[in-house]
Amino acid sequence: MEKVTNDTIKHVAALAQLEFSEEELAKFTPQMGKILEMAEELQAVDTTGVEETVQVVDRDTVFREDVPEKWQTREEMMKNVPDKSNGFVKVPVIIDKDDNQ
């Protein structure tokens, strides 16, 4: 396994659009290294003959029927929106488009 470095954490943080201080990087880098070491140990476990688990919760544990309810009017909702334009909710850009793509 590759050693986890500050650059590794910075790269993953950038992908998740997170920013960390140098103190946080110094703290998170060894923690992430330990987590990945544990995951590597799990990969070594022999699971031959073990049935795959796709859901750990019983599917019959529904507490109520999923019935849509009228929550509030559009106007009431728009009163709570911090940034709007022409009656639409404005949200920050999360995907940068490159002209070369």
UniProtKB/Swiss-Prot annotation:
Q: Which reaction does it catalyse?
A: L-glutamyl-tRNA(Gln) + L-glutamine + ATP + H2O = L-glutaminyl-tRNA(Gln) + L-glutamate + ADP + phosphate + H(+); L-aspartyl-tRNA(Asn) + L-glutamine + ATP + H2O = L-asparaginyl-tRNA(Asn) + L-glutamate + ADP + phosphate + 2 H(+)
- Main EC class of this protein? ligase
Q: Which UniProt keywords apply?
A: ATP-binding, Ligase, Nucleotide-binding, Protein biosynthesis
Q: Which SUPFAM superfamilies match?
A: Glu-tRNAGln amidotransferase C subunit (SSF141000)
Record GO terms (molecular function): asparaginyl-tRNA synthase (glutamine-hydrolyzing) activity; ATP binding; glutaminyl-tRNA synthase (glutamine-hydrolyzing) activity
> What is the annotated signal peptide range for this record?
none
Q: Which Pfam families match?
A: GatC (PF02686)
A GO term (biological process) for this protein?
A: translation
> Mind telling me which NCBIfam families this protein's record contains?
gatC
Query: What is the protein's quaternary organization?
Result: Heterotrimer of A, B and C subunits.
What is the role of the protein in this entry? Allows the formation of correctly charged Asn-tRNA(Asn) or Gln-tRNA(Gln) through the transamidation of misacylated Asp-tRNA(Asn) or Glu-tRNA(Gln) in organisms which lack either or both of asparaginyl-tRNA or glutaminyl-tRNA synthetases. The reaction takes place in the presence of glutamine and ATP through an activated phospho-Asp-tRNA(Asn) or phospho-Glu-tRNA(Gln).
Record-given protein name: Aspartyl/glutamyl-tRNA(Asn/Gln) amidotransferase subunit C
Gene name for this UniProt entry: gatC
